[in-house]
Amino acid sequence: MQEWSKQPEYQEVNPGGDVIIPCIIINKKGECRWERDGQPVGIHPGKYIWANPNEAAAESGDCSLKILDANLEFDDGVWQCQVTPSSFQLRDSLISEGAEVVVRGNY
């Protein structure tokens, strides 16, 4: 069965900076997915990438997401890591608690 090793946690980042949202799964067999404020977010080179690309592709369980060039409009919000079930017979999909990512403004 898949289970959490590390769930996403609160992060702060300056505009234009990079930030890694952790998400590590034990016995990962399903696929990693990310959502921001309830909306799916895909992997996009130059913006959203796997923090450890070789790890995410393998079964190591590291689904951590790296946000590049953070900005308030696209990146500030509540992020969730999700993992699809190991197989259609198992109900071991995972949905993390929401973790806030705060893009600091110029106040």
Kindly label every feature range from the protein language model.
Residues 1-5, 9, 35-64:
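Immunoglobulin-superfamily Ig-like beta-sandwich domains in protein ectodomains
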Residues 6-9, 17-21, 66-67, 87-88:
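Eukaryotic intrinsically disordered and solvent-exposed regulatory patches
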Residues 13-22, 58-62, 69-82:
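Solvent-exposed loop/turn motifs of extracellular immunoglobulin-like beta-sandwich domains
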Residues 23-27:
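Non-cytosolic beta-sheet module surface loops
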Residues 28-33:
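Solvent-exposed loop segments of extracellular immunoglobulin-like
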Residues 64-65, 101:
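Short beta-strand element of the conserved SAM-dependent methyltransferase core
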Residues 78-107:
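Extracellular/luminal immunoglobulin-like beta-sandwich modules
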